[in-house]
Amino acid sequence: MAHRKRQSTASSMLDHRARPGPIPHDQEPENEDTELPLESYVPTGLELGTLRPDSPTPEEQECHNHSPDGDSSSDYVNNTSEEEDYDEGLPEEEEGVTYYIRYCPEDDSYLEGMDCNGEEYLAHGAHPVDTDECQEAVEDWTDSVGPHTHSHGAENSQEYPDSHLPIPEDDPTVLEVHDQEEDGHYCPSKESYQDYYPPETNGNTGGASPYRMRRGDGDLEEQEEDIDQIVAEIKMSLSMTSITSASEASPEHMPELDPGDSTEACSPSDTGRGPSRQEARPKSLNLPPEVKHSGDPQRGLKTKTRTPEERPKWPQEQVCNGLEQPRKQQRSDLNGPTDNNNIPETKKVASFPSFVAVPGPCEPEDLIDGIIFAANYLGSTQLLSERNPSKNIRMMQAQEAVSRVKRMQKAAKIKKKANSEGDAQTLTEVDLFISTQRIKVLNADTQETMMDHALRTISYIADIGNIVVLMARRRMPRSASQDCIETTPGAQEGKKQYKMICHVFESEDAQLIAQSIGQAFSVAYQEFLRANGINPEDLSQKEYSDIINTQEMYNDDLIHFSNSENCKELQLEKHKGEILGVVVVESGWGSILPTVILANMMNGGPAARSGKLSIGDQIMSINGTSLVGLPLATCQGIIKGLKNQTQVKLNIVSCPPVTTVLIKRPDLKYQLGFSVQNGIICSLMRGGIAERGGVRVGHRIIEINGQSVVATAHEKIVQALSNSVGEIHMKTMPAAMFRLLTGQETPLYI
């Protein structure tokens, strides 16, 4: 059972009168961000993957766990970064290793966005990338920084196919001193993880940490969505019966915390560590008896206890104070009628169970207060990364970060030995503080804050043996954005390179640290729901899963692809040095076979001359090389490589350019599970009824229930989808193909 330290403990790291440490929930700076979008804490952005065969397989940290396949283990992905955060850069020593540097987020107004690649065709079509990755797709929901984005479900699944991202060596080392602001719109639906803090006493909900840099007047539009709209959207996804019963419940019935359920305070001698320091697990961890080290000194939990009345109170205050912020965009949940958005400003905290079961090594209550792990800080480095790389790329980046830090450590050790006869100490003992709000790195001896990251800024954490890699997103000021974003003119938003801060730690509890952070996302999301009068149990997907299991997969795609008459092997003749003369686009994540689609052919080119190809055909392989699951850029490179050949062998599946979608929705309470922006499908929830029906990311909706929506306003498309029940018939095609066919884009033949 979890134990928390008494608030009166003098040695608590949260007692700021004694020493710096994590800020208690009720003592957070007044200017902290107070906005809490619904998507803020959806833990579905986390993926689990293992590097050790003996790693346990925790369930996915999701509120809506639709996916039958749980990722196996303990590296966590938060592919939810759309907006950006200001973070203090770490000044680098000559050898490139950083120690004892304060590192704090300067702007807690971080908000993830969901765009459609800035315009209409999102790089999320990339999801078809790695074949394995398609099944491990990241599921997130966020607000968009683009035009109007409307969510059709509580989560979506996306993985980005540009999985050939090289780890740039030209920017190899530690963090630069200046902060720089990421500045791009990106589409794939993701969710942002927002810290929730008490609002400012003056009612200002601008949302910035004490380290926030001065903003210009032009940044007003970056303020986040008002929370009442978000709460309204959540409630629309619930049945009216459950909402009524929830709202009638009284706060007096909230589960009481046992006052005796706290541990003895750790004395200062317990927290100080000498050269023979042993690392101890928090008492809150649910470890099997054989795993616990009874002889280890328990640094235990250094937390602040809140009463049951206080806990729901501070997030609830934000509901009242968050209304003044302008909405960056309009967003509707297509789970129910879109006109039911009038939710009272004040909400009663219903008597819901404290927590729905959240798999993980910690007690949920302890994660709210914060737990501490002992670790050694090895160093930090910086990598360039795409906005949302695949899980494989994330792991490659983590390994690259470890390699860099170890090289820097080795160089520093050699240099120190050369300058002095003394022993070169390159390890820094730290306390790794994890809570549902933030992750802090504290000097184990002085308890000084070395690094401070809001939980929502953590994009990935992996354990590699006894090494923990923590990746956090950086936000860059617009004036320096060009120095930090590597891109080429005309490049897609998803192809831009963004700076990622990587901290490397060593701990015997590496796997538990990774799992605890993943669990923290889930607990934070449930806290947000409870604070706004929504019973987390109402979001149970059992009934929804029963509906899904009765539906056929991919509409009629299986029949079409299994029909041998549609599968053809073609031989094309061409002149040496002549291009094939085609334009290909991605089939879109969600298609049964993620590959490229023939979108256009050059008049008089080899492809058009043959008369064997048609627009809409899916190319399975070229000269024996399979294109299934490969990123678009890789497929284009293979086609370009045919220039000096005189014969080309193609395996294709003949398909019409328009895809037929059939979604079976028995009732409005069942979420559709995809989001739309300006007629483009931006995100898709893995395992949802939309995926079953053939919805594909990156496709433009052409027709809904027999009515053309090509020239229909975005709001009307959303309304039509929101109110549709029964069988929903749609016709879609890749957005890039639509733009080519309508003359909105000039084809670039290859």
From Swiss-Prot:
The entry's keywords:
Phosphoprotein, Protein transport, Repeat, Transport
List the biased-composition ranges (Acidic residues). Answer: 81-94
Kindly list the GO molecular function terms attached to this UniProt entry: amyloid-beta binding; identical protein binding; phosphatidylinositol-4,5-bisphosphate binding
Identify the InterPro entries for this entry.
Answer: APP-Binding, PDZ, PDZ_sf, PH-like_dom_sf, PTB/PI_dom
Domain-related comment: Composed of an N-terminal domain that binds STXBP1, a middle phosphotyrosine-binding domain (PID/PTB) that mediates binding with the cytoplasmic domain of the amyloid-beta precursor protein, and two C-terminal PDZ domains thought to attach proteins to the plasma membrane.
The function of this protein is: Putative function in synaptic vesicle exocytosis by binding to STXBP1, an essential component of the synaptic vesicle exocytotic machinery. May modulate processing of the amyloid-beta precursor protein (APP) and hence formation of APP-beta.
Q: What protein am I looking at?
A: Amyloid-beta A4 precursor protein-binding family A member 2
* The species this protein was found in: Rattus norvegicus (Rat)
Taxonomy, top ranks, is:
Eukaryota, Metazoa, Chordata, Craniata, Vertebrata
